[in-house]
């Protein structure tokens, strides 16, 4: 592996992320490119910190190039998220993908990916769903258990990072067959797990967001690289972090405004089985964002999926308006001596989103959606900013 790729959110960047970057170099990579969620993250929310802070954090701790994973691609289910990230990094020229997994066995993950791509699996999954499976995740695991010759294949699908890892492997098989998979064991706390002394200096991003909400930047200091902590202190002092209470109210306001139209959510991506009606009814009766999610969430419709649906609806992300894969490479920052690696990119590449917006119809549609997400996010910070900030944002070059 010469040019490693990592798909990340860095929400926020912490010691586990720095360890992963170091491991990519230890595996032999000369350079590491990151496809980083821009303006939105996969759970259907705004990131805690701005792109500039997260980009500089990654570059300070070992990344060589950081590209924006466009907001519509970042705010997506595991399959679409993985496909977008792999496609972006393949277009950048990466020959290896480094990612975390509870089961860091590349051969086993690829075996699971091959199974999930098979026609027999799709038929078994359809039968499980038709048979009244409690959830998609349960149906997925049951279908895999029914067909897998190795019981470990179905068992690994019971873990969240393994599920995303398998989707990365499926995307590699489909979009970048020459790319190698390099799974790494997850360090410290799992997603959503409470902090414990046994985890040492490692904490999950969700735990760090909770710590930040309770005690500000100082509270996360033990779990982030020393070189990154001053960036967090500056962001906190300047109010450049998300006010999630304000974000929820702003999102609900956008959804209420949309309800003035007839069938307001019929064309929103991800809508099926009458979800557009369920969403409209929930919007009309909810007075808080949490009430909205409570009204939408069921065993069949997990909260994360409903958060993504609500965000898509608030920002007007329709099914037929957005490319499924990134049509360009938006460079957020890089090391100056890594810039020659950009010469082999197979998509338009620039640090200027305005320039990329003019590179074709698909690029224009993706860039407009990205700007909508960015403008929503900057309004929802503790110290809000004016529209168009992403167009004015200076590239970050480190020596």
Feature roles, as predicted:
Residues 68-399:
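Active-site cores that bind ATP or allylic diphosphates and position pyrophosphate for catalysis
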Residues 55-70:
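A glycine-rich helix N-cap at a beta->alpha junction
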Residues 26-29, 56-60, 140-141, 180-181:
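Short hydrophobic/aromatic-rich motifs at helix boundaries and adjacent loops
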Residues 1-54:
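N-terminal catalytic cores of NTP/NDP-binding nucleotidyl/phosphoryl-transfer enzymes
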Residues 25, 59, 86-90:
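Non-catalytic positions within long, well-ordered alpha-helices that form the structural scaffold/packing
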Residues 7-8, 41-42, 58, 72-73, ...:
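Short, contiguous strand/loop micro-motifs
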Residues 31-32, 65, 179:
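Secondary-structure boundary/capping positions in well-ordered alpha/beta enzyme cores
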């Amino acid at each position: 592996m010469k040019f490693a790729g990592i798909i990340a959110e860095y929400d926020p960047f912490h010691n586990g992320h720095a360890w992963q970057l170091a491991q990519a170099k230890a595996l032999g990579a000369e350079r590491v490119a990151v496809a980083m969620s821009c303006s939105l993250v996969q759970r259907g929310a705004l990131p805690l910190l701005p792109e500039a802070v997260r980009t500089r954090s990654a570059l300070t701790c070992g990344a060589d190039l950081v590209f924006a994973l466009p907001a519509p691609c970042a705010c997506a289910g595991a399959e679409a998220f993985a496909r977008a990230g792999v496609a972006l990094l393949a277009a950048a020229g990466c020959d290896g993908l480094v990612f975390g997994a509870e089961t860091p066995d590349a051969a086993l993950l690829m075996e699971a990916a091959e199974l999930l791509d098979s026609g027999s699996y799709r038929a078994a999954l359809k039968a499980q769903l038709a048979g009244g499976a409690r959830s998609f995740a349960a149906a997925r695991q049951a279908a895999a258990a029914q067909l897998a010759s190795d019981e470990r294949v179905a068992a690994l699908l019971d873990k969240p990072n393994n599920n995303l890892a398998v989707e990365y492997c499926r995307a590699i098989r489909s979009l970048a067959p020459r790319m190698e998979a390099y799974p790494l064991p997850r360090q410290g706390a799992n997603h959503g797990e409470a902090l414990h002394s046994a985890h040492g200096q490692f904490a999950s991003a969700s735990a760090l967001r909770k710590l930040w909400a309770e005690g500000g930047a100082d509270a996360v200091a033990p779990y982030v690289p020393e070189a990154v902590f001053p960036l967090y202190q500056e962001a906190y002092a300047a109010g450049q972090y998300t006010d999630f209470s304000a974000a929820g109210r702003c999102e609900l306001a956008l959804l209420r405004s949309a309800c003035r139209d007839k069938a307001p959510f019929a064309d929103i991506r991800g809508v099926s089985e009458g979800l557009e009606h369920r969403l409209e009814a929930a919007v009309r009766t909810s007075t808080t964002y949490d009430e909205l999610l409570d009204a939408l969430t069921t065993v069949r419709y997990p909260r994360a999926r409903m958060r993504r649906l609500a965000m898509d609806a608030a920002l007007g992300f329709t099914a037929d308006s957005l490319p499924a894969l990134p049509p360009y490479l938006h460079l957020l920052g890089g090391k100056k001596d890594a810039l020659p690696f950009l010469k082999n990119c197979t998509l338009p590449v620039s640090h200027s989103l305005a320039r990329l917006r003019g590179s074709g119809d698909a690029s224009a549609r993706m860039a407009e959606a990205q700007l909508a997400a960015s403008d929503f996010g900057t309004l929802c910070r503790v110290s809000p900013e004016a529209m168009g900030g992403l167009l004015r944002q200076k590239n970050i070059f480190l020596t």
